[in-house]
Amino acid sequence: MRKTRVTAAEVAKLAGVSQPTVSRVFTPNSKVSKEKQEWVRDAAQQLGYLPNTLARSLNTGRSRTIGIVLAYLKNPFYTEALEKLSAGFRAHGYHIMTFFASNMAEDVDEVVEDLLAHQVDGIILASVSMSNTLTGRLQHYGIPFVLFNRGQPDRSLASVTAANFDGGRRAAEFLVAGGHKHIAHIAGWQKSLNGRERRAGFLAGLQEAGLAPFHVVDCHYRRAVAVEATRNLFSGPRVPDAIFVGNDHMAFAVLETLREDLGLSVPGDVSVVGYDDVAMAAWKTFDLTTLRQPANRMAEATVSILLSMIENGAASPGRIEIESALVIRGSARIPKGLTRNA
């Protein structure tokens, strides 16, 4: 059994090409004819050749590795988004390193320091906070980064989010059009710009209709907190006739609480609208009307922006907002003139 590593020179000899050609075949985006690529890959497979990515990174000055920092995967939206991001970067010959951190800026700073030690080419911060100190360090070292699904007050930073204010307003307009007068909001974490903007859009939509919110409560994107908030909303003599929930993850908990714990009919007694349109929203169990946060389009935009910054030295495009479409199912009363669209 052979114990020594197969070399590029051996592959080149068997394939009948030069050694630099072998290197180019295994370097993403290098120009090599399709015929020579087939020769080299066939020879590599026969010999059991494995490209030396470390050596290539030393030659090119790039690791072809992207670091992704996430706060959690409990929300199905992030599971889908991570899959889309990984596939997008793999298609361009990049590998992914995933790190987890809490939403505290200090924890994120520490994790990013680890990523920098791994010589990543770029960083995606997915729904986590970052300090001004970290922003300055990344800019100082010339490490491109994109904020995914997390806006920052500094709109010059590269970020990709849903149009959260508009989405919140559309949720309010839809519920008002359905004849609801007492609309509550189980809001997302108010220390995140996304949560604040969805709340602000919702309140603006109600104000335009001459309505005040029944009640607004920050549930931190946590199911258990959303369950408790739902019970509290229905514990007194006055109750809401509709609830806009800051994301689907919490909306599922709200629906279960309304139906199973409180014995209420949805949408007969109360309408529910979520935000994200994760796959589970279409399940018959939930049949959730929601605002679609398009993970695929957001991931495509994020990949494109970060690669342009890495490979072309492109400047930050600032904040990119992608429209959230209203997906009408069966958890909310449907206004006249509208129909289910999913």
Language-model regions: role of each:
Residues 14, 19-24, 58-74, 84, ...:
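Short beta-strand segments enriched in small/hydrophobic residues
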Residues 1-3, 46, 84-95, 132, ...:
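Bacterial carbohydrate/catabolite-sensing allosteric modules
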Residues 38, 47-114, 119-122, 200-203, ...:
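Amphipathic helical "hinge" segments at domain boundaries
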Residues 102-105, 126-131, 249:
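Short beta->alpha connector loops
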Residues 1-64, 333, 342:
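N-terminal helix-turn-helix DNA-binding module of bacterial transcription factors
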